[in-house]
């Protein structure tokens, strides 16, 4: 049984759904799902669960993301990125000092209004489709967490590289647009690269072509991060040998461990356990065939 998480290096001009289709074909299974959409024109880390690893989705999808984004001042667009129609222009020049001074106001908990051109849905319809039809929707502003935000390079006149670590659901193009508003200069996101999604990082990412080459060499299993490693952020809890069968059958075992999720072991990794009121039960079965 082939299972685990593969970290795909998604190129620009390819949708996250297209990556899933390719991964299904390469690993020859329909049990595939990605851990967070990347816009088609964005690039970078796209973790994809394969086989039984899809059971870990709820425990991995909320992890922090890290991005490198190029912010361009002097023009805003209707999509807040370089693919949209220009909405406003300005000849104003933004300096490094001006940008650095405003960035701290965008760290911590901030409120974002998701762009109309997005994968979010309203009444079962994507905001993107509603935007194309020219329809308005109620304000869907929400809080997100910006853990860190800094300028890492100046790329030219009115163009800077930002590094952002943030919570799930943060729109970097909206962040770029809002930074422009704060400085009184229209801005948009010119390019986006996701460098990390939780524990899944750029240096462990493989292109679809590289995955296909590994398959041809009979080395496809090398491309997968195991379910055990993917759950390594959880504390470990070991059961005695006589509790193995009861645990596998869903029966609870008494424990002094604090309430919360854990990696449950009985010699081998069994899966994700849940401790509650002095008992632990196997919540996500990841052992055996």
Which positions does each model-derived feature cover?
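Structural signature of FAD isoalloxazine-binding scaffolds in flavoprotein oxidoreductases
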Residues: 58-73, 137-151
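Extended alpha-helical targeting/anchoring segments
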Residues: 118, 122-146
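Short, charged/polar surface micro-motifs in flexible loops or helix N-caps
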Residues: 51-54, 76
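Acidic, low-complexity central loop/insert segments
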Residues: 59-111
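Active-site phosphate-binding and catalytic loops of NTP-dependent enzymes
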Residues: 29-35, 109-116
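Accessory RNA 3′-end/elbow-binding domains used by RNA modification enzymes
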Residues: 1-11, 17-38, 42-45, 63, ...
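Pseudouridine synthase
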Residues: 119, 126, 131, 158-203
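The conserved catalytic core of RNA pseudouridine synthases
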Residues: 23-29, 43, 47, 136-169, ...
């Amino acid at each position: 049984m082939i299972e685990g998480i593969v970290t795909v290096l998604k190129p620009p001009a390819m949708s996250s759904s297209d990556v899933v289709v390719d991964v299904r074909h390469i690993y020859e299974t329909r049990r595939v799902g990605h851990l967070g959409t990347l816009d088609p024109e964005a690039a970078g880390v796209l973790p994809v669960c394969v086989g039984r690893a899809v059971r870990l989705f709820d425990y991995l999808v909320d992890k922090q993301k890290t991005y490198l984004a190029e912010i361009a001042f002097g023009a805003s667009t209707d999509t807040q990125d370089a693919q949209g129609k220009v909405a406003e222009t300005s000849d104003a020049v933004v300096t490094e000092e001006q940008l650095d001074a405003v960035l701290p106001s965008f760290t911590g908990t901030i409120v974002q209004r998701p762009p109309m051109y997005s994968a979010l849905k309203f009444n079962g319809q994507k905001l993107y489709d509603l935007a194309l039809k020219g329809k308005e929707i109620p304000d869907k502003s929400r809080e997100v967490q910006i853990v860190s935000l800094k300028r890492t390079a100046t790329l030219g006149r009115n163009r800077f590289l930002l590094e952002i670590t943030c919570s799930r659901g943060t729109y970097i193009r909206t962040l770029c647009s809002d930074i422009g508003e704060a400085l009184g200069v229209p801005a948009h996101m010119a390019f986006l690269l996701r460098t990390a999604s939780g524990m899944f990082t750029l240096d462990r990412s493989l292109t679809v072509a590289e995955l296909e080459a590994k398959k041809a060499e009979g080395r496809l299993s090398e491309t997968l991060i195991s379910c055990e490693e993917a759950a390594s952020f959880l504390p470990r809890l070991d059961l005695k040998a006589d509790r193995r069968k009861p645990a596998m059958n869903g029966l609870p075992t008494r424990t002094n461990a604090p309430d919360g999720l854990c990696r449950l072991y009985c010699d081998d990794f069994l899966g994700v356990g849940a401790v509650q009121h002095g008992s632990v039960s196997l919540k996500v079965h990841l052992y055996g065939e």
